[in-house]
Protein backbone atom coordinates (compact mmCIF):
# COMPACT_ATOMS: atom_id res chain seq x y z
CA UNK A 1 0.00 0.00 0.00
CA UNK A 2 1.36 3.43 -1.02
CA UNK A 3 1.23 5.89 1.89
CA UNK A 4 3.06 8.67 0.05
CA UNK A 5 1.48 12.02 0.81
CA UNK A 6 -0.11 13.80 -2.14
CA UNK A 7 -0.21 17.50 -2.99
CA UNK A 8 -3.88 17.50 -1.98
CA UNK A 9 -2.96 16.03 1.41
CA UNK A 10 -0.45 18.82 1.95
CA UNK A 11 -2.90 21.55 0.92
CA UNK A 12 -5.60 20.15 3.20
CA UNK A 13 -3.12 20.03 6.06
CA UNK A 14 -2.13 23.65 5.43
CA UNK A 15 -5.70 24.96 5.45
CA UNK A 16 -6.52 22.95 8.57
CA UNK A 17 -3.54 24.51 10.37
CA UNK A 18 -3.97 28.05 9.04
CA UNK A 19 -7.70 28.62 9.25
CA UNK A 20 -7.67 32.34 8.48
CA UNK A 21 -8.25 33.26 4.83
CA UNK A 22 -5.10 33.92 2.78
CA UNK A 23 -5.07 37.26 0.98
CA UNK A 24 -6.16 36.42 -2.58
CA UNK A 25 -3.29 38.32 -4.21
CA UNK A 26 -0.75 36.13 -2.37
CA UNK A 27 -2.60 32.80 -2.39
CA UNK A 28 -0.83 31.65 -5.55
CA UNK A 29 2.57 32.44 -3.98
CA UNK A 30 1.71 30.40 -0.90
CA UNK A 31 0.41 27.41 -2.83
CA UNK A 32 3.26 27.34 -5.36
CA UNK A 33 5.87 27.38 -2.59
CA UNK A 34 3.96 24.71 -0.71
CA UNK A 35 3.70 22.46 -3.78
CA UNK A 36 7.36 22.96 -4.70
CA UNK A 37 8.49 21.98 -1.21
CA UNK A 38 6.12 19.02 -1.19
CA UNK A 39 7.40 17.61 -4.50
CA UNK A 40 10.97 17.84 -3.23
CA UNK A 41 10.29 16.27 0.14
CA UNK A 42 8.56 13.22 -1.34
CA UNK A 43 11.49 12.63 -3.71
CA UNK A 44 13.66 9.82 -2.35
CA UNK A 45 16.87 11.63 -3.34
CA UNK A 46 16.02 14.84 -1.50
CA UNK A 47 18.02 15.68 1.62
CA UNK A 48 17.31 18.76 3.71
CA UNK A 49 20.22 21.21 3.99
CA UNK A 50 20.74 24.80 5.26
CA UNK A 51 21.09 26.32 1.77
CA UNK A 52 17.69 24.88 0.87
CA UNK A 53 16.35 26.37 4.13
CA UNK A 54 17.76 29.79 3.22
CA UNK A 55 16.16 29.49 -0.21
CA UNK A 56 12.78 28.71 1.35
CA UNK A 57 12.88 31.55 3.88
CA UNK A 58 14.20 34.05 1.33
CA UNK A 59 11.62 33.08 -1.27
CA UNK A 60 8.82 33.38 1.28
CA UNK A 61 10.02 36.74 2.61
CA UNK A 62 10.55 38.27 -0.83
CA UNK A 63 7.33 37.14 -2.45
CA UNK A 64 5.20 37.76 0.64
CA UNK A 65 6.55 41.26 1.18
CA UNK A 66 3.67 43.66 1.75
CA UNK A 67 1.25 40.95 2.87
CA UNK A 68 -1.61 42.21 5.02
CA UNK A 69 -2.31 41.58 7.80
CA UNK A 70 1.43 41.55 8.55
CA UNK A 71 0.92 39.51 11.72
CA UNK A 72 -0.36 36.55 9.67
CA UNK A 73 2.92 36.02 7.79
CA UNK A 74 4.64 33.99 10.52
CA UNK A 75 1.56 31.82 10.94
CA UNK A 76 1.38 31.18 7.19
CA UNK A 77 5.06 30.21 7.01
CA UNK A 78 4.67 27.91 9.98
CA UNK A 79 1.61 26.26 8.40
CA UNK A 80 3.43 25.75 5.08
CA UNK A 81 6.21 23.87 6.88
CA UNK A 82 4.01 21.91 9.27
CA UNK A 83 1.70 20.84 6.43
CA UNK A 84 4.57 18.74 5.11
CA UNK A 85 5.96 17.73 8.48
CA UNK A 86 8.91 20.15 8.34
CA UNK A 87 10.08 22.20 11.31
CA UNK A 88 9.52 25.95 10.69
CA UNK A 89 11.70 26.92 13.66
CA UNK A 90 14.65 24.86 12.38
CA UNK A 91 14.12 26.19 8.86
CA UNK A 92 14.35 29.79 10.05
CA UNK A 93 17.24 29.03 12.39
CA UNK A 94 19.31 27.45 9.61
CA UNK A 95 18.46 30.28 7.23
CA UNK A 96 19.49 32.85 9.84
CA UNK A 97 22.82 31.08 10.51
CA UNK A 98 23.74 31.29 6.84
CA UNK A 99 22.51 34.88 6.64
CA UNK A 100 24.83 35.92 9.47
CA UNK A 101 27.70 33.98 7.92
CA UNK A 102 27.26 35.62 4.50
CA UNK A 103 27.01 39.10 6.00
CA UNK A 104 30.40 38.61 7.67
CA UNK A 105 32.23 37.72 4.44
CA UNK A 106 33.03 39.15 1.05
CA UNK A 107 31.89 37.24 -2.04
CA UNK A 108 35.41 35.87 -2.53
CA UNK A 109 35.59 34.77 1.11
CA UNK A 110 32.19 33.13 0.66
CA UNK A 111 33.46 31.23 -2.37
CA UNK A 112 36.62 30.21 -0.47
CA UNK A 113 34.47 28.98 2.43
CA UNK A 114 32.31 26.89 0.10
CA UNK A 115 35.41 25.53 -1.67
CA UNK A 116 37.00 24.52 1.62
CA UNK A 117 33.73 22.89 2.65
CA UNK A 118 33.49 20.84 -0.54
CA UNK A 119 37.12 19.74 -0.37
CA UNK A 120 37.75 19.05 3.29
CA UNK A 121 34.71 19.91 5.40
CA UNK A 122 35.24 22.07 8.48
CA UNK A 123 32.45 23.20 10.78
CA UNK A 124 28.98 21.65 10.82
CA UNK A 125 27.69 23.77 7.92
CA UNK A 126 30.75 23.01 5.82
CA UNK A 127 30.39 19.27 6.35
CA UNK A 128 26.82 19.52 5.08
CA UNK A 129 28.10 21.26 1.94
CA UNK A 130 30.76 18.57 1.53
CA UNK A 131 28.02 15.94 1.60
CA UNK A 132 26.23 17.83 -1.16
CA UNK A 133 29.35 18.08 -3.33
CA UNK A 134 30.10 14.37 -2.93
CA UNK A 135 26.56 13.11 -3.39
CA UNK A 136 26.06 11.96 -7.02
CA UNK A 137 22.30 11.76 -6.40
CA UNK A 138 22.01 15.21 -4.85
CA UNK A 139 18.53 16.55 -5.57
CA UNK A 140 19.12 20.04 -6.93
CA UNK A 141 16.18 22.46 -6.73
CA UNK A 142 15.23 26.04 -7.54
CA UNK A 143 15.02 26.75 -3.81
CA UNK A 144 18.62 25.56 -3.40
CA UNK A 145 19.62 27.94 -6.22
CA UNK A 146 17.87 30.82 -4.46
CA UNK A 147 19.74 29.95 -1.27
CA UNK A 148 23.10 30.10 -3.08
CA UNK A 149 22.16 33.37 -4.77
CA UNK A 150 21.17 34.83 -1.39
CA UNK A 151 24.59 33.97 0.06
CA UNK A 152 26.22 36.12 -2.63
CA UNK A 153 23.56 38.80 -2.32
CA UNK A 154 24.12 39.16 1.43
CA UNK A 155 27.91 39.09 1.29
CA UNK A 156 29.84 42.36 1.50
CA UNK A 157 29.61 44.23 -1.79
CA UNK A 158 26.56 42.30 -3.05
CA UNK A 159 28.09 41.09 -6.33
CA UNK A 160 24.64 40.06 -7.57
CA UNK A 161 24.23 43.68 -8.70
CA UNK A 162 27.30 43.34 -10.91
CA UNK A 163 26.43 40.98 -13.76
CA UNK A 164 30.06 40.56 -14.82
CA UNK A 165 31.22 39.56 -11.32
CA UNK A 166 28.21 37.30 -10.86
CA UNK A 167 28.98 35.56 -14.15
CA UNK A 168 32.46 34.77 -12.81
CA UNK A 169 31.38 33.47 -9.41
CA UNK A 170 28.42 31.25 -10.29
CA UNK A 171 30.34 28.80 -12.54
CA UNK A 172 32.97 28.40 -9.80
CA UNK A 173 30.34 27.61 -7.19
CA UNK A 174 28.65 25.12 -9.51
CA UNK A 175 31.97 23.39 -10.18
CA UNK A 176 32.83 23.17 -6.49
CA UNK A 177 29.41 21.76 -5.52
CA UNK A 178 29.04 19.58 -8.63
CA UNK A 179 25.72 21.07 -9.70
CA UNK A 180 24.48 22.05 -13.15
CA UNK A 181 25.46 25.59 -14.11
CA UNK A 182 22.81 25.77 -16.85
CA UNK A 183 20.03 24.78 -14.44
CA UNK A 184 21.25 27.26 -11.84
CA UNK A 185 21.46 30.11 -14.36
CA UNK A 186 17.99 29.35 -15.71
CA UNK A 187 16.40 29.13 -12.26
CA UNK A 188 18.03 32.37 -11.11
CA UNK A 189 16.92 34.15 -14.28
CA UNK A 190 13.31 33.10 -13.60
CA UNK A 191 13.61 33.99 -9.91
CA UNK A 192 14.96 37.48 -10.58
CA UNK A 193 12.37 38.04 -13.29
CA UNK A 194 9.58 37.04 -10.90
CA UNK A 195 10.94 39.42 -8.26
CA UNK A 196 10.74 42.25 -10.81
CA UNK A 197 7.19 41.26 -11.76
CA UNK A 198 5.94 41.11 -8.19
CA UNK A 199 7.61 44.46 -7.45
CA UNK A 200 5.65 45.94 -10.36
CA UNK A 201 2.42 44.37 -9.09
CA UNK A 202 3.02 45.76 -5.60
CA UNK A 203 3.74 49.21 -7.04
CA UNK A 204 0.53 49.08 -9.07
CA UNK A 205 -1.40 48.05 -5.94
CA UNK A 206 0.19 50.89 -3.96
CA UNK A 207 -0.74 53.36 -6.71
CA UNK A 208 -4.34 52.14 -6.71
CA UNK A 209 -4.59 52.37 -2.92
CA UNK A 210 -3.06 55.85 -2.96
CA UNK A 211 -5.51 56.99 -5.65
CA UNK A 212 -8.43 55.57 -3.65
CA UNK A 213 -7.18 57.32 -0.52
CA UNK A 214 -6.94 60.66 -2.32
CA UNK A 215 -10.40 60.19 -3.80
CA UNK A 216 -11.87 59.46 -0.35
CA UNK A 217 -10.12 62.50 1.10
CA UNK A 218 -11.41 64.69 -1.73
CA UNK A 219 -14.95 63.35 -1.28
CA UNK A 220 -14.75 63.93 2.47
CA UNK A 221 -13.46 67.48 2.00
CA UNK A 222 -16.24 68.17 -0.49
CA UNK A 223 -18.84 66.79 1.92
CA UNK A 224 -17.50 68.84 4.83
CA UNK A 225 -17.45 71.95 2.64
CA UNK A 226 -21.05 71.31 1.67
CA UNK A 227 -22.07 70.84 5.31
CA UNK A 228 -20.46 74.17 6.26
CA UNK A 229 -22.28 76.17 3.55
CA UNK A 230 -25.30 78.11 5.01
CA UNK A 231 -28.64 77.25 3.48
CA UNK A 232 -30.62 79.88 1.52
CA UNK A 233 -33.27 80.16 4.23
CA UNK A 234 -30.73 80.64 6.96
CA UNK A 235 -28.94 83.40 5.06
CA UNK A 236 -32.10 85.33 4.04
CA UNK A 237 -33.15 88.22 6.34
CA UNK A 238 -36.67 88.43 7.74
CA UNK A 239 -39.23 88.39 4.96
CA UNK A 240 -40.28 91.73 3.51
CA UNK A 241 -44.05 92.45 3.32
CA UNK A 242 -45.61 91.10 0.17
CA UNK A 243 -46.23 93.48 -2.71
CA UNK A 244 -49.91 92.70 -2.63
CA UNK A 245 -51.84 95.54 -0.96
CA UNK A 246 -55.34 95.02 0.17
CA UNK A 247 -57.76 97.40 -1.33
From Swiss-Prot:
Pfam families referenced in this protein's UniProt entry, alphabetically: ThylakoidFormat (PF11264)
Compositionally biased tracts (Polar residues): 228-247
Coiled coil (residue ranges): 198-224
InterPro entries, A to Z: Thf1
Keywords, sorted A to Z: Coiled coil
Any one GO BP annotation for this protein: photosystem II assembly
Signal sequence interval, chain numbering: none
Family listed: Belongs to the THF1 family.
Protein name per UniProt: Protein Thf1
UniProt source species: Acaryochloris marina (strain MBIC 11017)
Gene name for this UniProt entry: thf1
Amino acid sequence: MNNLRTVSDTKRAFYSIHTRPVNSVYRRVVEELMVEMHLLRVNEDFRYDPIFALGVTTSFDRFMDGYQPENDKDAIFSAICKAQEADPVQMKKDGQRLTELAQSKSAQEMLDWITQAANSGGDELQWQLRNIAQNPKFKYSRLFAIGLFTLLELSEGNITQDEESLAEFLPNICTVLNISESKLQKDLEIYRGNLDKIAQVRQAMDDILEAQKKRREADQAKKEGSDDTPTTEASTPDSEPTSEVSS
